[in-house]
Amino acid sequence: MRFQSINEINLTSVWAQLHLHQRSTRHVEMRDLFEAESDRFLNFSIDLNGFLLDFSKNRITGRSLDLLVELSKVAGLSDWVEAARLGEQINTSEHRAVMHFALRASVDDVYSVDGQNVVPVVHRELRRCFDFSEKIRQKIWCGFNGSPIRDVVNIGIGGSDLGPRLAVQALHPYALSDIRVHFVSNLDGADLAQTLEGLDQATTLFIVSSKSFSTPETLDNAYAAKAWFLQKAQGSDVSKHFVAISSNVEAVKDFGIAPEQMFRFWDWVGGRYSVWSAIGLSVMIAIGERHFRAFLDGAREMDQHFFTAPHEKNIPVVMALLGVWYNTFYGAHTHAIMPYAHGLARLPAYLQQLDMESNGKRVGRFGEMLDFDTGPVVWGEVGVNSQHAFFQLLHQGTRLVPCDFILPLRSHYAIGQHHQQLVANCLAQTEALMRGKTDTEVLEELQAAGVTGELLDALLPQKVFPGNQPSNTIVIDELSPHFLGMLLAAYEHKVFVQGVIWGINSFDQWGVEYGKQLAKRIAPELASTKPPKHDSSTNALIERYRTRGCRS
């Protein structure tokens, strides 16, 4: 069943039952559930070939999960998944298919768009990318003076930056040591200028990533990079040092990049789902074909699990249902991401775009206003750094903050007992958030330490931890290309499932357009002497720039 109008999902019986169930169980303590259920971990965890989702530390019972699974069925999740697989235009506002999972398909898979199997063209483009990346890696592709490429600069923004940047950092142990990969996304000139410091035009390759090749931030940086390059090179040398990831052949040619040095992706691939495509060229150069294929294979394994596993044993579905439970029925409003792996430091930023650009919407897929809470604010920080930043709020604040902990069991860097201590910290935090520390337990600790009288009375409430903060723990064997692929694909599918339940089109992003329109209007006004015609605040800020800012 696919909903066609406003409020149908929240007028269903299961929606009402979930509200009643939340009210009747909201004071249940997770520590009590663990004490009462010796097999709670087994009942509330899913292991997929070394990828473990432990969701036992959540405010749920078996009844909670049953109701949430029923909600997914009533929302027509299976139908929507099948529609996506069949290439139907589930991106309803832009009338496009959504087929990013075809980017990691095997040669024998069949995924069709407009009646054509797209898998062969995907593999042909991948082959072109691999061949080019191997020329860079093997020092066959050289710069204008015959020197091999030593630095690769990826210029892009949003999905053309966040995914590749995350993957290159996460998979650093698998990368070549003699080719450095850099990323430029910010329109602040400091980003490009500081990246170019110490680079040599003769040994630098630029990858300009923009599907339309008209993204202002990307093109401004690309033309500035080209100007820097031409300080030491000739115009004819551009072809050796610039390649494009785009679908706009003419714009790429106008920039000076030959069509044979343009790698393409398709309108059925959204930017935030594109790291698996030619957008991942910088990743391919860093880690090579074998490891990039392992990255794709990991994602495909999660795809097949998502397509075939029953909802109650389906990792992305369960992750999504728990998010709906807290955001829509508990009013949590935020979701924290804590990867206990330095290589995943960029994961929170990547998931911010994936989740909030997809589901940060108040309008349903058919234009109706939604009157329930949808996508959360996603935020986070890496590992123990987060403990020394915001865990005070998680442990003793006033807000419910569901958390995801991501933990590799093995490290690529065996330095003393570092990794064992890291694992201990991660597991300790999940237990502490769940269990808390009661006033009775605190009292016993203080008395055992000899604290009495007024000091005891003052310290006692300060040292109580309410606990009952929900979390998922995602455990992977190691941070490898395969497991990274599984992890990112799991979150992709999670976001899709939530969009289906909330009645949202998760594959457009109209909210990013309005600010761009105003910026185009304001930019010439900054250099003008005419009075600006905005609100008083914006007018005053424009005038302040005119008098105190630097014109360029």
UniProtKB/Swiss-Prot annotation:
GO BP field: gluconeogenesis; glucose 6-phosphate metabolic process; glycolytic process
CDD domains documented for this protein: SIS_PGI_1, SIS_PGI_2
InterPro entries: G6P_Isomerase (IPR001672), G6P_Isomerase_C (IPR023096), Phosphoglucose_isomerase_CS (IPR018189), SIS_dom_sf (IPR046348), SIS_PGI_1 (IPR035476), SIS_PGI_2 (IPR035482)
EC number(s) stated in the UniProt entry for this protein: 5.3.1.9
Keywords, comma-separated and alphabetical: Cytoplasm, Gluconeogenesis, Glycolysis, Isomerase
Keyword Transport attached: no
Cell compartment(s), UniProt: Cytoplasm
The UniProt record lists the keyword Amino-acid biosynthesis: no
UniProt region (Disordered), positions on chain: 525-552
GO molecular function, one term: carbohydrate derivative binding
GO cellular component: cytosol
Pfam families in alphabetical order: PGI
Active site: 357, 388, 516
Catalysed reactions, semicolon-separated: alpha-D-glucose 6-phosphate = beta-D-fructose 6-phosphate
UniProt similarity note: Belongs to the GPI family.
Role of this protein: Catalyzes the reversible isomerization of glucose-6-phosphate to fructose-6-phosphate.
Protein name, entry field: Glucose-6-phosphate isomerase
Source organism (scientific name): Laribacter hongkongensis (strain HLHK9)
